[in-house]
């Protein structure tokens, strides 16, 4: 597959004699603080708030927890909250070999909308009880996948519907519910294979559940950063007609219907812009749900429960959902992360591209490489090793060879995986045979060499992205503060051994550079 070469510069140059290009860093969105309340309702408040904090990260799953919370509240108000939560009515969640529970979260339409069973929201949430982290990875609905021999290749959002329809065609005796259960299983299996991680559960909510939840909390406030004009929004009656939807810039109050339209619209923007708006809406729901007026009101809590109704589907048992409540206290706001796959090779998660299409063909996305290997490594990194990015380590990438473009190609490569490369350029020496990795900030701070390289981010990078060279135990003269200024914690001085490694793994370096050894030029 073909890629393309781009460049991006953030700010000015350091006083070093050799130009170094600074880079724009990715942003992590975290959840807010938990409110406090006294007495019995403090216990209820803490329980529900914890799970609405989760809703900003794993919204669909939170709906199930709210459902369980209301059942606990209505069935056993006279019992101690702690006694209920830690009772035998909870079952531990399934986990992988790393102790993570991975849940596929889905958002679909409803019977009144075209494509009612298209999964337009696909998210994998990974819960690590031991470290108290929740990491979420969004998969674009337009990702092109092979469904089966009959349907061939299609967008992943159609997999559930096509599988269920095929099941009902092949087995006329089964019910529609059984057919869609099979569809959920196949979709879960497909996402698991794409990401190369086990997925233990799925959970799905539809448009009705979404709008009713917003209405149940009396609307939400959203700060609209850019005016949205969509003359092609689907009509409310589910017909082939359109309606015009417009939202102006500024703080807006949305009811359920308007919030849904704001989150769904994409005809005049893009799928990725829509994903950003969806995050805005989910955050607004969470903020409103955290307000005392909602969480301390049994009536409003009951409205939330009633809004869920049949609009929520999951293979999580009620006992497992109660177990989620049991472990909720382990998850703090600064241990919750959200990522997404996209088609911008200069951004974190930018492993996809839009192939040319014939007139009338649907928009689709494919991986830059002919397999899911880099997407799988990314999923492993962000879902199973969130501590890597939590370390906050910064890097400077330097080309120590005569091969042009090594630093810039490595820059793009590392940015796609979310590493914070603050500068890149040429090394003082352009004839470096063996890559050198300098833990600059640690050594300058007086740390021992062992302590300076004891870093989760650096360890993962050396194992998976820069698997050549060696680490330096002291700061060379050319990189001393007198001779060289760097904003980075780690300096990566790339040598000829790294160029040779690039040649063997050239498919990951988008730009079609021809890598050959210097000796063979």
Regions found by a protein language model. Give the residues of each.
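Non-catalytic, solvent-exposed segments at the cell envelope interface
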Residues: 2-521
């Amino acid at each position: 597959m073909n890629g393309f070469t781009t460049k991006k510069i953030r700010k000015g140059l350091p006083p070093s004699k050799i130009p170094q290009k600074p880079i724009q860093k990715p942003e992590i969105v975290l959840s807010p603080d938990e409110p406090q309340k006294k007495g019995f309702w403090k216990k209820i408040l803490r329980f529900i708030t914890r799970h609405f904090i989760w809703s900003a990260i794993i919204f669909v799953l939170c709906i199930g927890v709210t459902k369980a919370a209301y059942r606990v509240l209505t069935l056993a108000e006279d019992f101690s909250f702690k006694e209920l939560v830690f009772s035998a009515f909870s079952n531990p969640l399934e986990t992988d070999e790393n102790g993570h529970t991975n849940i596929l979260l889905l958002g679909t339409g409803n019977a009144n909308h075209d494509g009612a069973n298209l999964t337009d929201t696909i998210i994998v949430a990974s819960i690590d009880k031991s470290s108290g982290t929740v990491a979420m990875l969004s998969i674009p609905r337009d990702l092109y996948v092979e469904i089966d021999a009959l349907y061939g290749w299609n967008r992943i959002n159609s997999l559930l519907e096509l599988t269920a329809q095929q099941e009902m065609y092949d087995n006329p005796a089964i019910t529609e519910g059984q057919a869609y259960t099979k569809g959920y299983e196949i979709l879960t299996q497909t996402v698991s294979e794409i990401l190369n991680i086990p997925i233990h559960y799925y959970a799905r909510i539809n448009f009705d559940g979404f709008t009713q939840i917003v209405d149940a909390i009396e609307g939400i406030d959203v700060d609209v950063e850019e005016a949205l004009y969509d003359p092609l929004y689907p009509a409310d009656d589910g017909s082939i007609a359109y309606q015009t939807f417009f939202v102006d810039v500024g703080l807006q109050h949305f009811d359920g219907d308007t919030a849904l339209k704001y989150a769904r619209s994409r005809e005049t923007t893009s799928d990725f812009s829509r994903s950003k708006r969806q995050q805005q809406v989910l955050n607004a729901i969470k903020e409103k749900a955290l307000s005392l007026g909602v969480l301390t009101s049994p009536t409003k809590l009951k409205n939330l429960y009633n809004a869920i109704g049949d609009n929520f589907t999951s293979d999580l048992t009620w006992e497992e959902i109660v177990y989620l409540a049991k472990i909720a206290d382990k998850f703090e706001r600064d241990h919750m992360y959200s990522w997404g796959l996209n088609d911008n090779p200069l951004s974190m998660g930018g492993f996809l591209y839009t192939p040319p299409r014939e007139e009338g063909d649907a928009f689709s996305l494919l991986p830059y490489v002919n397999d899911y290997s880099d997407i799988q490594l990314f999923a492993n990194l962000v879902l199973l090793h969130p501590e890597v990015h939590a370390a906050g380590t910064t890097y400077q990438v330097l080309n120590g060879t005569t091969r042009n473009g090594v630093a810039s190609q490595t820059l793009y490569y590392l940015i796609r995986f979310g590493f914070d490369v603050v500068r890149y350029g040429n090394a003082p020496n352009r004839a470096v045979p063996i890559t050198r990795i300098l833990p600059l900030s640690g050594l300058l701070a007086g740390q021992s060499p062992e302590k300076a390289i004891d870093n989760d981010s650096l360890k993962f990078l050396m194992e998976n992205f820069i698997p050549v060279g060696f680490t330096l135990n002291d700061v060379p003269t050319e990189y001393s503060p007198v001779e060289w200024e760097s904003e980075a914690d780690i300096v990566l001085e790339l040598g000829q051994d790294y160029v040779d490694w690039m040649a063997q793994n050239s498919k990951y370096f988008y730009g079609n550079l021809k890598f050959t050894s210097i000796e063979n030029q």
